[in-house]
């Protein structure tokens, strides 16, 4: 049975993850620190290099670089599934990202499209924050 609390939690969770990708459009990088938990438990895997497991500080730096390097950024979240376990939640979905990868030094750009999957783990402390991100490409 889904209670009203679970409905508002679900809405909050999807909004936080959408905010993560909206940063690619708005370039408001300060939001990255608002929606991700600055904690030693934070971790992430990316769909672009480097592929190793990253901590909070490294993740933020690479996310900032990624979002400022892609102009005309857009994304689509498909088939989201949210599972809530008390004060933690998992959001898994299919993800399409596209834009123009810009090389400011060479004044060139390359259109990119990344089809992939994403899993976000969030922790309610006291509001929902991202504690883990796993992005992976699907080679088509």
Regions found by a protein language model. Name each.
Residues 1-35:
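Short, low-complexity N-terminal intrinsically disordered segments enriched in polar/charged residues
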Residues 29-84:
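A solvent-exposed, acidic/Ser-Thr-rich amphipathic alpha-helical stretch
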Residues 36, 94-97, 134:
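A mature extracytoplasmic/lumenal domain signature
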Residues 51-53, 99-101, 138-140:
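A short local loop/turn or secondary-structure capping micro-motif enriched for an aromatic residue
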Residues 68-69, 98-111:
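Short, cysteine-centered beta-strand-loop-beta hairpins and adjacent loop/turn segments enriched
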Residues 77-79, 92, 130:
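Hydrophobic residues on conserved beta-strands that form the core of alpha/beta folds
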Residues 86-103:
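A short hydrophobic beta-strand element
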Residues 90, 110-140:
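Short beta-strand edge/turn micro-motifs at domain boundaries
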């Amino acid at each position: 049975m889904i209670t009203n609390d679970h409905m508002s939690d679900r809405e909050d969770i999807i909004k936080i993850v959408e905010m993560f990708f909206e940063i690619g459009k708005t370039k408001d990088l300060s939001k990255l620190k608002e929606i991700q938990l600055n904690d030693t438990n934070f971790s992430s895997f990316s769909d672009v290099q480097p592929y190793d497991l990253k901590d909070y500080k490294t993740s933020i730096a690479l996310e900032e670089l990624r979002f400022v390097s892609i102009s005309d950024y857009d994304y689509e979240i498909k088939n989201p599934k949210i599972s809530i376990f008390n004060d933690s939640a998992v959001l898994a979905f299919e993800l399409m990202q596209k834009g123009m990868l810009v090389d400011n030094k060479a004044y060139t750009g390359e259109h990119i499209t990344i089809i992939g999957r994403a899993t976000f783990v969030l922790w309610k402390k006291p509001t929902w924050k991202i504690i883990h991100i796993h992005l992976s490409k699907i080679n088509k």
